[in-house]
């Protein structure tokens, strides 16, 4: 109603005679959080820039951070939940994170573990930013959220530039801005 009053008082010359229909829609809020394994699109997984950890629980965020922050990373089968990965998560005290992690909890995680966390989404093969941190910490982790009808899943982006690189005639390495996803 205030909008209608402002419109009338703004000098438009129009007068509202009657309101024919008024509707109110209420939706249940479900914050974006991530749970168990979801396979990536072939267009994304073929770029070899992500590690999609095949977990059966809701700890994909913890496993992604563990892989990214591992001081002695494994050489093979990085997409599997191994004893080594579980031990890294215990050593770094990542097992204290409340799962599943929602976007509003990321600031607390960043301060607690001294790590910058950027989250990206995808629409088909196209990548876009969902949450870019303003804080600067000693480590930086980029995550991709993939979704299906039921749930979401975090995937560690190991090489952001390679993830966004498309096949072109130019063979030189391209560097991408995380905010606008443009290369230079």
Question: How does the language model describe each region?
Answer:
Residues 1-184:
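Metal-dependent nucleotidyl/phosphoryl-transfer cores and adjacent nucleic-acid-binding surfaces
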């Amino acid at each position: 109603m205030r909008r209608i009053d402002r419109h009338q008082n703004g000098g438009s010359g129009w007068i509202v005679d009657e309101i024919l229909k008024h509707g109110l829609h209420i939706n249940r809020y479900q914050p974006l959080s991530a749970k168990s394994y979801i396979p990536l699109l072939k267009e994304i997984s073929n770029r070899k820039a992500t590690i999609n950890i095949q977990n059966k629980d809701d700890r994909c965020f913890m496993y992604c951070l563990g892989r990214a922050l591992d001081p002695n990373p494994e050489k093979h089968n990085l997409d599997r939940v191994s004893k080594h990965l579980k031990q890294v998560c215990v050593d770094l005290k990542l097992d204290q994170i409340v799962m599943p992690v929602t976007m509003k909890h990321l600031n607390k995680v960043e301060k607690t573990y001294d790590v910058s966390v950027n989250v990206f989404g995808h629409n088909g093969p196209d990548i876009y930013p969902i949450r870019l941190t303003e804080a600067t910490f000693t480590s930086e982790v980029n995550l991709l959220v993939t979704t299906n009808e039921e749930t979401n899943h975090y995937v560690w982006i190991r090489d952001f530039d390679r993830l966004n690189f498309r096949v072109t005639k130019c063979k030189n390495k391209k560097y991408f801005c995380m905010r606008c996803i443009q290369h230079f």
